[in-house]
């Protein structure tokens, strides 16, 4: 059997939704619209949005108070949400619903004091946002695992209460290599 991949391929539903949120904000409110992190890893889409008035920033300290900020499909940490609220920023949350589901699970593990493994890539905006959902004050911890070597070096306190989640954009192959 021969499989042909179309090029270019489309975006996932979460990214499509995030792009639509930025487009609608530009239409309704006009530029500038600030977006925390690039809404998608696609230079053509990002440049088009930038040309229409979207301003992509890495951190909230790059924007003035009382402006519109859109959180990208990758999601953000609780600390970023708290900072935005404290500064009176008008936030539109374009976090992918699948990422939000992972955030909710991590927050629940945190509340229950369970240790949690996040399988993902260090430095990726989704991983940073997911790690930032965990509050270790209940006695648990969250660990980032990128590969099999990290698993070999991992020391958990209670393997019976260990949970794991994954970065939503990881391939099944990458994930299964770590889990197996």
UniProtKB/Swiss-Prot annotation:
Required co-factors: [4Fe-4S] cluster
Catalysed conversion reaction: isopentenyl diphosphate + 2 oxidized [2Fe-2S]-[ferredoxin] + H2O = (2E)-4-hydroxy-3-methylbut-2-enyl diphosphate + 2 reduced [2Fe-2S]-[ferredoxin] + 2 H(+); dimethylallyl diphosphate + 2 oxidized [2Fe-2S]-[ferredoxin] + H2O = (2E)-4-hydroxy-3-methylbut-2-enyl diphosphate + 2 reduced [2Fe-2S]-[ferredoxin] + 2 H(+)
Pathway: Isoprenoid biosynthesis; dimethylallyl diphosphate biosynthesis; dimethylallyl diphosphate from (2E)-4-hydroxy-3-methylbutenyl diphosphate: step 1/1; Isoprenoid biosynthesis; isopentenyl diphosphate biosynthesis via DXP pathway; isopentenyl diphosphate from 1-deoxy-D-xylulose 5-phosphate: step 6/6
Xref: InterPro entries: LytB/IspH
BP terms from Gene Ontology: dimethylallyl diphosphate biosynthetic process; isopentenyl diphosphate biosynthetic process, methylerythritol 4-phosphate pathway
Binding site for dimethylallyl diphosphate: 41, 74, 124
Catalytic residues (UniProt): 126 (proton donor)
Residues given in the record as (2E)-4-hydroxy-3-methylbut-2-enyl diphosphate binding sites: 41, 74, 124, 168
Binding-site residues for [4Fe-4S] cluster, renumbered to this chain: 12, 96
Similarity-based family: Belongs to the IspH family.
NCBIfam families (alphabetical): ispH_lytB
Protein name: 4-hydroxy-3-methylbut-2-enyl diphosphate reductase
Source organism: Pseudomonas fluorescens
């Amino acid at each position: 059997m021969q499989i042909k991949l179309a090029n270019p391929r489309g975006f996932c539903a979460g990214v499509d939704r995030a792009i639509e949120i930025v487009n609608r904000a530009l239409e309704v409110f006009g530029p500038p619209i600030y977006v925390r992190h690039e809404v998608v890893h696609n230079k053509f889409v990002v440049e088009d949005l930038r040309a229409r008035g979207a301003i992509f920033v890495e951190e909230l300290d790059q924007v003035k108070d009382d402006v519109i900020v859109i959180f990208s499909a990758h999601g953000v940490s609780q600390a970023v949400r708290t900072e935005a609220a404290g500064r009176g920023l008008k936030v539109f949350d374009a976090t992918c619903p699948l990422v939000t589901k992972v955030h909710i699970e991590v927050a629940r593990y945190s509340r229950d004091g369970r240790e949690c493994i996040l399988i993902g890539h260090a430095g990726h905006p989704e991983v940073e946002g997911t790690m930032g959902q965990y509050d270790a004050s209940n006695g648990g911890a969250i660990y980032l695992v990128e590969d099999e070597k990290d698993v070999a070096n991992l020391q958990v306190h209670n393997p019976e209460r260990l949970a794991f989640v994954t970065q939503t954009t990881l391939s099944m192959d990458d994930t299964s290599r770590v889990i197996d």
